[in-house]
């Protein structure tokens, strides 16, 4: 699109948080026609707003009032359940540890929200994500200036065509500057904590939440020699590298070193734990992925030397990426990686450019 800003209508996904609020303010300052949209993605049915949806809506309304813009609302809870939450449960049932934020971006924020915004007459949508997009030629997903807050890890699965109609107004800002702008603008949320964790779980214990939807299957915990050293409550409640909550201690044959989850044996319903943070079973050098989702739908020539992350905010890790057939890749890291977790995502970078990623299927 080549419209001038004053002729360009942008609908900002406003969560009630400081980031999306400042995103809207920056677009107004740049001369765009701006409206907000508050989306509700989870219908609480237990009488408690774990998602703090009502508080968040009030915060978004306060900001919209200060900015003098219209605030739309939309309920995407049905789409969220069908496209995100059902997959989340299926992955946990299969013993993997999914990342629903990645799927939420792909299916809700950059699909359902974008489609709805277009029906409202938007030329673009905008969000408070810390990311940048190059709109020269084919859209490229670029890291944010604030590398500590960069969220390209969570955006890698979004179809690149969606970025042609997306603006990221915070991509060139550091977080402290965002809070300063919010305070300067008179936003009540300028000191509001960043949201953490999964919205629909909120402050509840993860185990308490998950057992509402999936029946637990308790079983044995074994050490790396096959000795039974405890009992687990259900494999789905544990993630690789986890230390807390194992209930192992005081074994006469063991040292005082802490125990960590090293593996899940799904066939036997056994959790395997090892002692010591540097135990070899906690590390892997190679992973195999599910089919890749390249941002530009074009894979680089493989094998390729790239950097990768297997979790958010992890420092870039050097690796060689090789074609494994059927759209999958094999990743060989320069250094062994700790607690690489099936169900999570590996995301690839070439300098500042986020190339894409895939769900981790297995490690070696």
Curated annotation (Swiss-Prot):
A Gene Ontology cellular component where this protein is annotated is: cytoplasm
Recorded hits in InterPro entries, A to Z, give: MnmA-like, MnmA-like_C, MnmA-like_central, MnmA-like_central_sf, Rossmann-like_a/b/a_fold
| Catalysed reactions, as listed in the record | S-sulfanyl-L-cysteinyl-[protein] + uridine(34) in tRNA + AH2 + ATP = 2-thiouridine(34) in tRNA + L-cysteinyl-[protein] + A + AMP + diphosphate + H(+)
- Note the site residues: Interaction with tRNA: 129, 344
Where does the UniProt annotation locate this protein?
Answer: Cytoplasm
Q: What is this protein for, i.e. what is its function?
A: Catalyzes the 2-thiolation of uridine at the wobble position (U34) of tRNA, leading to the formation of s(2)U34.
What is the protein name stated in its UniProt record?
A: tRNA-specific 2-thiouridylase MnmA
Q: Which organism is it from?
A: Alcanivorax borkumensis (strain ATCC 700651 / DSM 11573 / NCIMB 13689 / SK2)
